[in-house]
Design a protein with these regions (language model features):
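Accessory RNA-recognition modules of RNA-modification enzymes
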Residues: 1-179
Length: 179
């Protein structure tokens, strides 16, 4: 017997995780929607069902958050190297600071008396100085792929450059593919 196909659903995103997944509360169950932001109304399709939560794919943003921006990278969404490029720099820092505070309180049982402002680059780009890149010879493409793994897949993302990597590292991706 064939599995029943689930219909797309609509929900309001009430919070966001450290890795850029929006959290919706649908009939008492948490649903993590990849790429959705706090304050947005989205249409999504559930992909993985668990006992306490579900994971979903974003189909459409019906009411966008003011934090949402156009990602700089052409392979954002496919590439697993970063998950918050669709969020403004200031809001990315706020999401990460909130995740740190939540983890310290929930896991470490520590509540700092005061917080220092995060240290960040002037414009926030590029911000990554280290990376673990995958390398795979793909005869069908006629070259070696060098890059991050695709999000939710074991494949190497076909990329020539990376917007978040510091320039000395970013400049090595394409030459390494030619080896």
């Amino acid at each position: 017997m064939a599995r029943k196909r689930r219909e797309p659903e609509t929900a309001a995103i009430v919070s966001v995780t450290h890795d850029g997944r929006g959290i919706a509360d649908v009939t008492g169950k948490k649903v993590f929607v990849a790429g959705a932001l706090e304050g947005e109304t989205v249409r999504f399709q559930r992909r993985k069902r668990r006992r306490n939560f579900d994971e979903a794919e974003l189909l459409e943003v019906l009411d966008a958050s003011p934090s949402r921006i156009e990602p700089r990278c052409a392979v954002f969404g496919t590439c697993g190297g970063c998950s918050l490029q669709h969020v403004s720099d200031a809001d990315q820092r706020a999401i990460k600071a909130r995740a740190l505070a939540d983890n310290l309180e929930r896991i470490g049982k520590v509540t700092p008396a005061n917080w220092l402002d995060p240290i960040h680059a002037t414009d926030g780009w590029p911000y990554r100085r280290r990376a673990r890149l995958a390398v795979k010879d793909v005869p069908a493409k006629g070259r070696v792929l060098v890059g991050f793994r695709e999000s939710h897949a074991p494949y190497v993302c076909d990329m020539q450059r990376c917007e978040v990597l510091a320039k000395p590292i970013d400049g090595l991706i394409d030459p390494l593919s030619d080896l």
